[in-house]
Regions:
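Detector for methionine-enriched segments
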Residues: 1-2, 89
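Catalytic-loop region of hydrolases
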Residues: 2-68
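N-terminal cap/lid subdomain of alpha/beta-hydrolase-fold enzymes
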Residues: 49-106
């Protein structure tokens, strides 16, 4: 995994998230969401390639100087994104009224 991250020079502009459903306010950071291709021949359920989904939320202070924190949570699927990123320590919180900034974000 670290080899994959070491090869990334920056998040592609096409992965920049500019709006989220239910969240109408602006936020003081950038959000990227996309897929990283995993090279190699695979014999996994007849697939010939694999991808890993990522979300990058830049620092609210100084993204060029602040350290990059990676967080990996189990899954499978979207449950790990929703539970951890939107209810534990991420920049956003979700409730029955929609999305809002998380005042306790890392």
């Amino acid at each position: 995994m670290m080899q994959l991250l070491a090869a990334v020079l920056g998040a592609p502009d096409g992965d920049l998230v500019t709006a989220l459903p239910g969240f109408n306010a602006s936020w003081p950071f950038k959000v990227y969401s996309g897929y990283l291709s995993v090279p190699g021949p695979f014999e996994l359920n007849s697939y010939d390639s694999l991808s890993i989904h990522y979300q990058l939320h830049t620092s609210q202070r100084d993204p060029a100087k602040d350290p990059l924190v990676t967080w990996h949570q189990g899954g499978p699927g979207g449950s790990s994104i929703n539970v951890g990123l939107y209810t534990e320590m991420g920049y956003f919180s979700l409730d029955d009224k929609g999305g809002h900034a998380n005042p306790f974000a890392w």
